[in-house]
């Protein structure tokens, strides 16, 4: 995301607290190119359970690498009776499922939000 911060008061920005209302949960679906490759089937079972639980209460945004992975995840979630009406898939390239580290950082800006984007290097390529 590219945006200008000129003429903006940085003191108006803040991190939302973990307990504040949220619109959705954001996850990246594991695939063979992620750090879960050796345990992919086991990890997918956990993601399916997570997806079914989250969609009982709110929306879920799932990042997938391509259309084939989206179809695969959709089938698994559907079989687990996740509410697919609350799921949004976004296709993007990624090699790390830990979106807390590599995903967007959300800031409150008055009544709105800003997303910060940065280049995550896996702690200087420690695991690359």
Give residue spans per PLM region:
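The feature marks the mature, well-folded catalytic cores of soluble enzymes
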Residues: 2-128
